[in-house]
C-alpha cells in the first residue's frame, strides 16, 4: 500500500476490476427485490459538463447504496441522439450528423467511465440507431390505425432561418430559441398525438405519485389546465354575415353572459377571413397577427391589438347585436378560435375595451366593502366568482351567486339549444412533425388512391440515410427521390414516403422502458422483463423537464400499457430534481456596450478577511475585471469548469465527494476550487489513517464486552455515524450531511489511542465503517482500502453497515449545570442515576458551590439527560 494517496492509479485499478468482473451487469432475478435507478440520458453534445457530472453522480450514489442493501440494481445509460444541434454542427464542420454524433458518444462514454459510474453498459441504447427507432415507428403505425395519431392542418411557429416548425416552448419573445429569427405563423399538414384523450387520467394519476416533488406536480396540473364551463352559441346576424350559423365560444364564466358587449375571433377564423375580403386594412392586420407567436406565454405579454369587422352576432339571451372583432390575443387552437368579451369582469377584455372605446357593462357587484364600480380602473373584485359578489343588471338573473347564476343561465341556454356544460383542458394535442433531417422518419406513405398508409410491420424500420450533410435550407429528405419514391403497400401504385421526422421528445418518452430489454427483437418490449424492472424506482433530472419530457413520458407509458406492453400505470415512482451547478462570473464591458466574459480559471481574485471576493484581475494582463455574481455554468457566460481537467488533476473520487458535499441534491451547487481542495484533503486523511493502521498489521477481533469507557465512546461515535448516514442517504438523499457524519467520525478515529489490541480492533471497525459509508460516494478509494483492510470480497458486494443499538447506550452522561440560567459547570453521572443523585452531584460541584455560597436555593430543575438549573437568591 502506497504511503501517499494516488488517485489515478487507484481509480484505474478499481475500474479495471469492475470491467473484468462485469460487476454491473444485471439480469432479472424474480426472487430478489429490484431497484431501477435512472438519470435522464444525455444529448451527445461532445463533452460532459458539470451538470451531467452532478446528475450522474447522484444517480450512482443512490444505485450503489441500494446494491449494498442487497437489492438487484439496474442503472443503465444511453444517448438521446437525434436533434437539431447535430445538424447545426454538421453544417458548420461539413460532416454528416451521424458521424459527429457517434464520435461524441465514444468520447462522452469514456468520460462517464472515468467517473466510475456503476452502469450496465450491455443495455446501452442510442436513439438514432434503427434497432431503437424501428419500435417507435411500429408503435406509431399501431396508434395511427387506432386514431390516437391523426393528421390535420395545424397553425405552427415557422422559423424562416432554420426552415422548420418550432414548439411553443421553443419560441421565446416571438423569436426562435436557436436562430433568434422572428417567427411566422403557417398552416401545414402535421401528425398529432391525441394526448388530450388522456388529459383526465394524466391529471388524476398525479395523485398516485407521493414520491414526486409537489412543485413538479403543480406545474403539470397547471399545464393540463382543467376548467369547467359552457360552450355557448351566438347566432349569426344574417343581415351582416349573409347566412345562418353560430359562433361557438367556450367560457368558464357563463354567470357574466349578460355583460358580454362584443366577441373576438382569431386571425385565422372563417369570419375574419370573410370580413377581410373587401377590407385591405383588416387583411393587413390579420397578416400581422399571423406573424406573431402562438405560445400562450407570448400572447399573455404582447400588446393586445384588435380591429373591428363589419360583422355582428346576436346575444343568445337578449338578441342584442354584438360586434365581431379580430384580436391578436385569441388563439385558433383554443376552443373554436373565438371568445365572448365581458369587459366589466375580465381584465384582458377590460383593457381592450378601454383601448378601443367599447362598452363596459357591470353585471356583478361586491356585497360589502369598496364596491364602487369604475369603468376606467380595474379592481381585483371585478373578476371574483365567490360568495363576496352577486349578479346585478342581469334582469331575471339578478341577486344570484356564481354557482346559482351559472346554473340558471346554463339551463336557459340549453333550453334554447344555444349552450351546453363542458369541461375543457388547456392541454393541446402534441404535434410531432418536424421538417428536419436528423430525426426518426415518420412511417407513412402518401398514395393518391389510398391516402395515408402506415408502413407495414415487415417493412420497418424506415431507415434514415446516415451519410447526408444538411445545408440548412429545409429538409434534405424532401430533395432525395431515392428516399421518398416508393410503392403503396395497399395498391402497389407509385407513392411518396413522408419526409418529415418526429419530434425528438418521442425518443425520450419511452427509452426508460427499452432499457429493460434493449436486445429484444420480438417486439417493442419484452413484457416479462418490462414488468420486472418497471416502474423506475428513482428518476433523476433537472426541473426544466418538469412539464414536457415528464408529461410525454407519462403519456407514452399509458399508451404502452394500453397496447399491452407494460403492466404499470406510471413510469417513475420517485423523482429527484437536482439543482443547477453555478459558478462566479467575470467580464469586461466592450466598446459597443457588450460583455466579454472570462473563465474563472483565468482570473485571480482578491478576498477580504471573511473570504468574500472584493476584487478580480485577469491573469494574462493583470488588469481588473468586473465581478458578475454567481450564475448557472454556461458557455455564454464562460464560467464552466471542464470535468475532465478536474478528474485529471484530483481524481474522480474528489470530484464526486465535492459534488455530494457542497449542497443537498435539490439545491443549487456553487462551484468552489477551495471546496474541491478540501474534498481532496479529506480523502488524503482517510488514506493516511488507513495506511498507518494497515502498516502496523491487521488486528484480531474486537471484544465488545471488555471495552473501557473511553473505548465505548469511540465505538459509540462509529455507530452514531452509521445511524446518521443511513437516515441521510437511505431516506432523505441528504448526502452532504451523511458525509459530514463521516468527517466527524474521522476526527474521533484520528484522535483515538492505538496502544493495545482492543484499540487497534476498534480503529479497524471505525475504518471499515468509513469505507462502507463512503463506498457509494467515493467508490475507487473504498474499493482499494476495503481490500487493504483484509476483505477478500469487493466493497461493492459488501452490505451497508447496520447500527448496533447497544453501542449507542451510554453508561455515563455529561450534564450541564446552570445557576440562575447561567452555565457554571458540567457533571458526569451514571445513565441510570436517580433525580436525587443528579441533584446531589450538581449541588456538590466545586464551581457551583462558589456561585451558590451565601444564597438560599429556592428550587432545582432537572431536565433528564440534558441539564440541571439551580435557582438561588
From Swiss-Prot:
GO terms for cellular component: cytosol. It is found in: Cytoplasm. One of its GO terms (biological process) is leucyl-tRNA aminoacylation. This is Leucine--tRNA ligase. GO terms for molecular function: aminoacyl-tRNA deacylase activity; ATP binding; leucine-tRNA ligase activity. ATP binds at residue 635. It holds the Pfam family Anticodon_1. A motif ('HIGH' region) lies at residues 42-52. Its EC number is 6.1.1.4. A motif ('KMSKS' region) lies at residues 632-636. Belongs to the class-I aminoacyl-tRNA synthetase family. Residues 624-643 are annotated as: Disordered. Keywords: Aminoacyl-tRNA synthetase, ATP-binding, Cytoplasm, Ligase, Nucleotide-binding, Protein biosynthesis. It catalyses: tRNA(Leu) + L-leucine + ATP = L-leucyl-tRNA(Leu) + AMP + diphosphate. The keyword ATP-binding applies. The lineage of its organism: Bacteria, Pseudomonadati, Pseudomonadota, Gammaproteobacteria, Pseudomonadales.
